[in-house]
């Protein structure tokens, strides 16, 4: 877990927090929920939310982050989503759903950006996501469900994540296959 800086507070290395920035050491140290809670309790004017890192670092936690079109996503995959812990914010038509990816698949999957999905959702894998506390635009995140009973990611989600990794690898091969030193010469 990671304590999240309150939106608008000064960051240690300059700039202003956006409300999603984790405490710097949380990038390198594995902080327990208790350690995160202690940081927030000691400096509530500075830290007001809890984040979590996804992927192998968190035993395979993956977050399906629906930023728009929640109704369409629930119509398509609602049966699987109903079993997962759900995090909502004041933002309409949005929610986050928590799953785990089995360890044997960790090297076969990747995150998916909002733009890449094209459907108003993204997949957080190897990245950080907010779970609880202050929502950057005002209000708070609300958790429904049991964090001790996070289900395995459904097949369709794992397949999307596998396709994302394949697309990224194909793109790297394509870029590496060209020698740009000669392309602009006449």
Segments predicted by a language model, with ranges:
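Conserved phosphate/metal-binding and DNA-contacting active-site motifs used
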Residues: 1-185
């Amino acid at each position: 877990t990671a304590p999240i800086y309150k939106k608008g507070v000064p960051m240690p290395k300059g700039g202003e927090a956006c409300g999603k920035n984790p405490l710097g050491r949380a990038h390198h140290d594995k902080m327990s929920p208790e350690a995160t809670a202690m940081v927030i309790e000691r400096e509530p004017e500075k830290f007001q939310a809890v984040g979590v890192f996804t992927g192998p670092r968190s035993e395979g936690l993956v977050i399906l982050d629906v930023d728009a079109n929640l109704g369409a996503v629930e119509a398509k995959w609602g049966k699987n989503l109903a079993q997962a812990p759900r995090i909502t914010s004041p933002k309409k038509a949005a929610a986050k759903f928590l799953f785990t990816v089995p360890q044997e698949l960790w090297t076969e999957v990747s995150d998916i950006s909002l733009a890449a999905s094209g459907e108003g959702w993204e997949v957080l894998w190897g990245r950080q996501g907010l779970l609880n506390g202050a929502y950057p635009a005002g209000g708070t995140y609300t958790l429904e469900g049991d964090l001790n009973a996070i289900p395995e990611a459904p097949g369709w989600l794992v397949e999307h994540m596998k396709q994302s990794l394949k697309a990224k690898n194909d793109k790297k091969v394509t870029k590496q296959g060209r020698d740009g030193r000669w392309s602009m010469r006449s």
